């Protein structure tokens, strides 16, 4: 059995196991390495989050053994006390691999059906990244935020190639809610980009292979409001065309065609349509390439879609209590124009040949 399959099997068993740590009371516990701790939600346990972000799959067995219990399918783990934190680096490993539930894709917010675009609430999309660009004539100014992305590991952000190819792109901000206010309760992380990995077959100005990965200069510290999204690596997701599903898209893009970007993080839910229907919609546009490497989502009547500034952001599918990224915002006609769905790079088409190798 491969390492990935072993990990998946290991995590799948957690829900059926009794707690593996010794729990002395409702709060106190003993960690797998015999340190005193308290049972907390994994999203607020900094030592285990640090282990997860730096050691990835290598941390899986220790994390599995740290489970105290589950509450509403959310793992409660034995979090070491402050004096025990020097022992957190127990495991070895520095490869960045796709994380699996429950270590990704968890949102603090219950998402009901969104029938129209609306502002997101704090903690709803902890993996959403705003991409920052330098002003060519005045690099000292604050970044210009004009593309989106998603955190997929502690060092990698997934985005669109047509965003990554711009020379002025240099920084990402993750976990923000309002890009200009500091009183929104968010605690965003802003980290510069070390390198850009653009799909080798992408050609500037052409809509094919519109996908890229940004490697950051340092680890992103996971927290309650900064957390990665899951990639659709399981077979039941890889082999799904997602037609008639209603995924979410979120970003700080324009609210109208050629309008200014939104300061507030906005979200909308859109239905995935067939590629045949999508191809017919874009038949008169020679530059539109609707192939099996993209998926399309939107309403026939228009009015709800990703827009300028949302480019590179994630199309997010909820499965039970976990969100998976199934698309990357690529292009559309105007902004939520009637008869023209949004076109997204299909993540499952690029997992093995591009995304996973680029994360190593």
From Swiss-Prot:
Limits of the Clip domain: 28-79
**Enzyme Commission identifier(s):** 3.4.21.-
What the entry lists under SMART domains is as follows: CLIP, Tryp_SPc
- What is a single cellular component term in the Gene Ontology annotation? extracellular region
- All disulfide bonds of the chain are 29-78, 39-68, 45-79, 104-230, 147-163, 278-296, 307-335
* Coiled-coil residue windows: none
Q: Which residue ranges run through the membrane?
A: none
Keywords carried by this UniProt record: Blood coagulation cascade activating toxin, Calcium, Disulfide bond, Fibrinolytic toxin, Glycoprotein, Hemostasis impairing toxin, Hydrolase, Metal-binding, Protease, Prothrombin activator, Secreted, Serine protease, Signal, Toxin, Zymogen
Q: Which residues form the propeptide?
A: 27-113
Keyword Disulfide bond on entry: yes
Instruction: Describe tissue expression.
Output: Expressed by the venom gland.
Sequence ranges assigned to domain Peptidase S1 in this UniProt record: 114-360
The record, for InterPro entries, names:
CLIP, CLIP_sf, Peptidase_S1_PA, Peptidase_S1_PA_chymotrypsin, Peptidase_S1A, Trypsin_dom, TRYPSIN_HIS, TRYPSIN_SER
| Compartment list | Secreted
> Which residues does the record list as glycosylated?
108
Domain of life from the UniProt record: Eukaryota
A GO molecular-function descriptor: toxin activity
Query: Could you give a single Gene Ontology term from the biological process aspect?
Result: proteolysis
Active site (catalytic residues) = 162, 210, 311
Q: What sort of enzyme, by top EC class, is this?
A: hydrolase
Which of this chain's residues are annotated to bind Ca(2+)? 176, 178, 181, 184
Its UniProt domain note says: The clip domain consists of 35-55 residues which are 'knitted' together usually by 3 conserved disulfide bonds forming a clip-like compact structure.
Q: Give the function comment from the record.
A: Multifunctional venom serine protease. In insects, it acts as an arthropod prophenoloxidase-activating factor, thereby triggering the phenoloxidase cascade. When injected into larvae, it induces a lethal melanization response in target insects by modulating the innate immune response. In mammals, it converts fibrinogen into fibrin, activates prothrombin, and also degrades fibrin. In mammal, it may act in a cooperative manner with the serine protease inhibitor Bi-KTI (AC G3LH89) to promote the spread of bee venom under anti-bleeding conditions.
Which family is this protein grouped under?
A: Belongs to the peptidase S1 family. CLIP subfamily.
Q: Any extra remark in the record? A: Negative results: does not activate plasminogen.
The protein depicted here goes by the name: Venom serine protease Bi-VSP
Q: Which organism is it from?
A: Bombus ignitus
